[in-house]
Amino acid sequence: DGIHGIWFDYNKAYEILKHFAGIITPDFSLFSDFPLPLKWWNIYRMRAFGFWCTTLGINVINNVRWNNDTLDICYQGIPKNGIVAIGAVASRLKYLKNRGDFEQYFINMIEELQPHTIIIYGSTNYACFKNLWTSGIKIVSFPSRRNKKKADAGDAQ
């Protein structure tokens, strides 16, 4: 069922999730070619799933996903001065043409939410992440499968 299984079969999801100390909310896509209501729906689903887990006593770290169309709502429901997670893989940062917008939105997210810790899935080998090391924001990174394969091959990014 993939990521949608947790939304449509939430009781089964709970039976699995209750065994963990906490979760990162799901990363429902906000592709640029999605209609705006679908982007809003996916942001809603991320926050609603996190809220539901919180009501069940599960610790929640909010995943943050944004694009130009959703900056007015993408941070709603996420506590300030906390821990957030982002995915660098789906952001397509490896392509130079995507980095400018990503960095702008990333800075906007930091200003808006003022997180003390950011969990990053994917490579942190980009200027916007390296600048955070001196800002006092803790960065916790988890390499993607691709990054792990490259590291194993001796060609880490």
PLM segments and residue spans:
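Eukaryote-skewed repeat-based solenoidal scaffolds used as protein-protein interaction platforms
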Residues: 4-151
